[in-house]
Amino acid sequence: MIPRWLLLVSCLVLALIAQPGAAKKSSQPQWTLKEIDHKPNALFFFEDTETVLVNTRNGDLHRSFDGGNEWEIVEGEDGRMKHQVALLLQHPYDSHRAYALGIDGHHWITTDQAKTWREFTLDELPAMRNPPLVFHGQDPSKVIFQGEDCVGRFCIVRSYYTDDDFRTTEILRESVGGCSWALGHPQFAEDSDLAKEIQNRTLCVVPGLKVPLPYANRLVYSDGYFNSDKEGTEVKLQEGRPVAGVMRTAAIKKFLVAAARSRGTDELALYVTVDTKNWHRAEFGGHRLEEDAYTMLESTNYSLQVDVLTSPKSGMGVLFTSNSDGTYFTRNVEHTNRDMRGTVDFEKIANIQGIVMVNVVDNPKEVENGGKNKRVVSKISFDDGRTFQPLKVDDKKLHLHSVTSYANIGRVFSSPAPGLVMGVGNTGDHLKDYSEGDLYISDDAGVTWRHALEHSHKYEFGDQGAVVIAMRDDEKTNKLEYSIDHGKSWESVELDKKIYPIMVTTTPDSTSLKFLIVGSTSKHDGDGTYITYAVDFAGLHERKCEKDDFDEQWPARLDENGEPDCLMGHKQFFRRRKPNADCFIDEEFKDPQPIFKPCKCTAEDFECEYKRSEDGEGCELPPSLQPPEGKCKKPTDTFKGPSGWRLIPGNACEREGGKNLDEEIERSCEKVGVPTDGKIKQTKQFFDSEPVVYRYMERQSSNSGDDETVLVITRNVEFFISHDHGKTWEQPLKGEKVNRLVLHPYHNDVAFLLTEGKEGYYTIDRGYTFKPFKTPLPPTQQTYLPPLAFHPQYKDWLIWTGAADCSSTSGDCHDDAYFSKNRGESWELLLRYVRRCEFEASENRPDSENLIFCEQHESESKSNPLHLLSSENFFADSRDHYTDLVNYATMSEFIIAAFKDPENPDALVATTSVDGKTFAEARFPPNLHIPVKTAYTVLESTTHAIFLHVKAGSTAEYGPLIKSNSNGTSYVLSLDAVNENRAGFADFEKMKGLEGVAVVNVVGNVEEVSKGAKKKLKTMISHNDGAQWALLPPPEKDADGKAFGCSVTKGKGTPDCSLHLHGYTERKDERDTYSSGSAIGMMIAVGNVGDHLSDSEADTFITNDGGITWKSARKGRHMWEYGDAGSVIVLVPEDVPTDKLYYSVDEGDSWEEYRFSDVEMQIEDITTVPSDTSKNFLLWGREMKSDSGKKIATVNIDFSGLRSRQCKLDEDGHANDDYRLWEPKHPFQTDNCLFGHVEQYHRKKPDAACWNNWREPHVHSIGKNCSCTRADFECDYNFEPQSDGSCKLVPGLPLPDAEAICRADPDRIEYWEPSGYRRVPQSTCMGGDEFDHVKTKPCPHKEKEYEKKHGISGVGLFFAIVIPIAVAGGIGYYAYTRWDGKFGQIRLGEGTSGSHEWLSRDSLLVTVPIAIIAGVVAVGRALPLLAMSMWRSASGYVRLGGSRGYSRPYASRGSFAARRGDYSSVVEDEDELLGVEDLDEDDDEN
């Protein structure tokens, strides 16, 4: 019998013998082949695991826990994940979390590296134009989920947040640019207490308070998820002030970046912060950033890397690197290679500081000028981009394909394997096609390179570089090549099936010996089978590396002498396996750790605190630097001050024995400037010929630089330009005869100069350079029409209207239209025999990008009438809207066309379109007593309604002012007998910056004028967009303190004594408006006080409260201009020689005199930048007593020396020493409600001795939405205003057809009975007195649905009516016996806040009980019926409905439409059958 112990020993020996040879050296790697049914969309490993996820095109999620040896489809609970995963996302900062986003509102999360998945629901599709998930940099359970609704280019983004891994989700807010976390990266604020303060801070890009268009977008934040403060707090991006036009934000390591673009320019401003509190605009040394023309690149812990597009046509850029706070950028590399998507050939070598590889274009001038192909070359930097050198294979230059042509996933060249770098490319003088490339490798971080394999390959690193694999990707193959000696020698193995490799990858840290290869058996997408190979190299070596197999301190960077190099104050080393060691490191998921040794401080360890000097050797001091008190009494003095250098934050260099550039040095007072002297300066320049055309190129907030550019054409067709507001003038096109100047109306940096022939010049950089262009024909000879038309969105799209056959003797001189998409480099014929053509693209009209309207003569003959045509494909085909067209105009969102009435050729018919496709005939009010309408004038429209002036007769120079509803089809009379001149222009002006304020002149003696008398004009003002008008209240005294010649009623204009102003029809220059878009609430005008406007008596008047009160500024006529957003106002005497001007720095409360010339001048005009934000003004005139004749001159008046500091705006936005919060008022109201809301503006206090320096007047807040009052309504169609403010049906006319809305919408249940009122389009009021919604009625055949909607039970009706009678009766009797008894007519429009006595007429205790008492008898008669209904209700037989519906609050309008969720419901507007509530591009407010 065999002993048991012997059996046991025998078994153990056999077991040992039977062990597989895994520990023995194998001749080749092992692999496993698996098939996947559909193409992989996304693939990634969880860090430090062999768990890999693959999302396939059919919506499945595949999972493997062993690196791809075995796969399973994740089905989730009840199999709901199958075929439902649209997007797979990995948490970038947490190695345990991933997210599978579905297509039907069901989404899934894993927090245990895909072992389990938990479903969460959000009824949103993941956003496509914005990040669908936004991650918190420190708390992985906090995520923002984003969905979006897009129309054309515009999206409304709905952001939700979770702080518990989607166990619960809450709405964060709606926005237009998405939301993000302030702590958006683990390195942001990681070393400060700030992280605790801003843990929950979120930032969102939201619409402007009044204008939901991109140029008004705001960046707001909340520390409480916008719960307690729905609007949030606006971020102060620039010098403690908010900025409009914010586009997006990005978290980049320790930096948070926001990009903004103003209206009228492509230039972007980039704002950077490291704490979310203090933001600074990044400076690029005079270089422009443009939209879609910059790329944020992989950055370091101490600087940002940005590539800026310089040549859009050829795809080249400039690489900039910032200082440590991201505020000042220096140029590192010129002519970087980019593709059309903005991808840049730039990559940092992984894990090694300071090594950067870029591809640059070697022939930039040939590419830009000659259209030749780019010659791309590769360069590498070992000193963080300070210097670059070519890559070398022996003595040959090497060029590698980079990011723009990458064919794998992950990094292009490197991995965490220290020092190993690979790439596909070629040697020679430039980079060739990818198909011609070979594989190259370096094992010294790019210092030297060697040829690895023929042909292009996909490649990957494993086991910290101990294994390198490659697979040819230019053909179908099953050959896998590998190297275990850093690419010096290669072996290969043949896999089972040939594939076209799609990706070759491994674990993120490249420490594993396992690789995953994914490929397809077919070259064509979607065909064939998709295969994965899991390849394992663990058996290739028998042993694990020991100490002698390593270089213990392999230097990561070498200097030019081959010695370890210093960067950021230290040298970097790694412990690395020797290339020829026959072992594997086999330390899976253990990342190689760098070893640092400190260096002595050198100049490279310091940076400029502000920015480099022009020579690049030193540092400029910041403009805010002031010398110590008592120093710098004169420019030659010196003082001890900062050097301008600082040690780069995070730099670890040793100061002892090194350089210390940040020590204080002796500074010259001349370089920091002397304090402002409080004086005004003037500069006079003379012209040989009179300037006849002068225009400003306005600078926007996002424009860099500080130029104030003026363009001039003189009478002898010479062109001049000034960049310093007329202090100096240049002639860049000297000798050229320039006779037309055309500014691009949508891009303020662009202007065109035209000659009489086919040649012209343009500038796109505000006149610093001019380039020639040619036109297909000479410009049109119609002098009243500009030859160029511009596209609102694309600045290079032009339409040219030129004169054809005008030099021939055929007599067929006509105009043809051509279009260009490349700023005139080439032209194509659009239409022949046109009068004009215009682009009609608008944000208000979705899909209108290619919409063009043209006026063309029928049958291409000038003797035939005009047709109005439109096309969306450049007239490959077209739509004919009207024959016998007279004219058409575009105003705001409306297109208005007038054509001859077929039934009466002497009359015109007006039509309107909102969408550019469908026109509707305008319905004029019946009280418009003009039988034959011969002329219309389309007036300014910025409030979602058209103001139209209709000529009263063929000879009359006046006519009614009518106003449309929000789609331009139905008009009501606003005001009669508005003055016009012979040219048809009307005395009508909207106040800039304030909603609804308009000033007009009316003819006060129409009957006498019709008999030949002279017109007597009266000035009237409206504060609610033409719904109500009043005479202007006169000041009590004139400028000299004397009384006027009529009896002034304080605060009110009367027929015998009011203020009258000279208006639009009398102006020399239509640009000289009463108001300014930046000087909110202010107007200046010339006029007089009396019963009508005088031709002879005229003084200058000013208001600073929107026209409610006026004061006399100075006696006599003056021209005026505003500066610095109203903080300085300048007056110059008009039509008389003078050498003096008058200015005010306190909104006209006081005036100072300044002598600007040694001799008197006849001043023809005073100008400044259109935004009125400059501190410079320009006088245009002639010297009157010059020895050499009356010299033509300009005089620059510079006020910048008057003040030394910028006004300070407190962080909390409240009023302070420099600013007040100002609310526009309505003269007939006491609650500051205008258009249903209260607005607040920041306005400088008149006595604050500082400058605004604010280019954009900013609405601080919409304080609240108000209850509706009469001021929120105007008279409806067929109704006319009465003397008491009410609206009454015009006698003999029927009520409007209110049921029409039911016919237009078959699903509609009810409609509102006509009340005589309609809401002012821009009002946002809620509740209160809704004059337009008094009573509803059921639509025909919808009585049952109506009753079901509005009915209440008998019990409810009993308690709603009977119970309050006792209380109401008691209070009513008490009021009746003690009130004054004056129950008179209730006048519409009288406020409820004039008296606060509880028994006054306006007291609710009086008005409400009286109404109830009046109904007592009717209620009493209803009691038996009610009792019966209660019984029936309880018995379940019938339900009695109420006879009247609930008046729902009116919804938001216009710009408030984007603020979804603010209002409870939306009321359909019977008038708005043609379109939706449109956005107003022409609004000036943010």
Swiss-Prot record:
One of its GO terms (biological process) is protein targeting to vacuole. The keyword Transcription regulation does not apply. Glycans are attached at residues 200, 301, 967, 1265. GO terms for cellular component: cytosol; Golgi apparatus; membrane. Coiled coil: none annotated. Residues 1-23 form the signal peptide. Residues 1372-1407 are cytoplasmic. InterPro entries: Sialidase_sf, Sortilin_C, Sortilin_N, VPS10, VPS10-sortilin, WD40/YVTN_repeat-like_dom_sf. Pfam families: Sortilin-Vps10 (PF15902), Sortilin_C (PF15901). The keyword Glycoprotein applies. It is a multi-pass membrane protein. This is Vacuolar protein sorting/targeting protein 10. It comes from Aspergillus terreus (strain NIH 2624 / FGSC A1156).
